[in-house]
A protein has these predicted regions:
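Class I SAM-dependent methyltransferase SAM/SAH-binding core
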Residues: 32-88
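Conserved Class I S-adenosyl-L-methionine
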Residues: 40-42, 156-248
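A short glycine-rich, Lys/Arg-flanked "PGG" loop and its adjoining helix->strand segment in the class I
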Residues: 110-125
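A short acidic, Gly/Pro-enriched loop at the edge of an enzyme's catalytic core
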Residues: 89-97
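Conserved class I S-adenosyl-L-methionine
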Residues: 1-34, 42-46, 65-68, 125-150
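Short catalytic micro-motifs in class I SAM-dependent methyltransferases
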Residues: 101-102
């Protein structure tokens, strides 16, 4: 289960990529905007503020997240619905689809992008941001520490060049780039607290009691060695992939 309060820690660092993505979306009028993996809805709300004339729909499969998002709803202008991205299909063509840090949870990106392209209306736009730090120490140490206890999903995020090729093959114009953010996180065991909000969630759901506490202690020790805390905080490099694809 998603923990909205845990995810909201380091809010500034987590939301910055969204606004970097937003800055590259063609600034024109959109009638229907869909935010896939809307979470607590705060960034969906930002889309509604940026394009006040549009109907904005946030989609998420987590009841916990949607419970928080519902407080922001403005029926007919800003709505939230429960659905799984892997099965989502709009009732009508969409002008702008935004997927901020959500596609990494969905398998088979080639098929996924085909469905997204099919959902776009004329001159429609697909804007995506995904973490691509699965070879970073935080993830490598997670795999090593949990080995044999909990099966972990394989990294399904593709090289950025592969996304360009797939999207161009679908007839879309593509603007793609990568960014490595150098976050300086504050607080004790900051990287552990960060990962608890995302990649660590399935592991914590699978373990319980003493086994869970033993895992957390071992993982925290390894993270402290890989990411030493300094008087200024803990430096945490985080690579992300972005692309904005437009129907010609």
């Amino acid at each position: 289960m998603w923990d909205a309060s845990q995810y909201e820690k380091f809010r500034g660092e987590r939301t910055r990529p969204f606004f970097d993505l937003l800055s590259r979306i063609p600034d024109r009028s959109y009638q229907v905007i869909v935010d896939l993996g809307c979470g607590t809805g705060d960034l969906t709300d930002a889309l509604a503020e940026h394009w006040p004339e549009a109907r904005v729909i946030g989609v998420d499969h987590s009841e916990e997240m949607l419970k928080s998002a519902a407080e922001r709803a403005d029926p007919g202008r800003l709505d939230f619905v429960k659905d799984d991205i892997a099965a989502w299909k709009p009732a009508q063509p969409v002008d702008l689809i935004v997927a901020n840090a959500s596609f990494q949870w969905v398998a088979d990106h080639e098929s996924l992008l085909g469905r997204m392209a099919a959902a776009l209306g004329p001159k429609g736009v697909l804007a995506v941001q995904m973490p691509a730090n699965f070879e970073s120490p935080s993830h490598v140490l997670l795999k090593e520490t949990v080995a044999g206890k909990v099966p972990l999903r394989h990294d399904i995020v593709l090289p950025v060049g592969r996304y360009v090729a797939i999207l161009q093959g679908l007839g879309l114009h593509v603007d793609a780039w990568e960014t490595v953010y150098q976050h300086v996180l504050q607080g004790k065991d900051a990287v552990l607290e960060w990962v608890k909000g995302t990649a660590l969630r399935p592991v914590l759901e699978a373990l319980a009691g003493a086994e869970r506490e033993e895992f957390l202690a071992a993982y925290a020790t390894r993270l402290r060695a890989a990411y030493p805390e300094t008087p200024s905080g803990t430096l945490f490099a985080f690579r992300r992939i972005f692309f904005v694809a437009t129907r010609r």
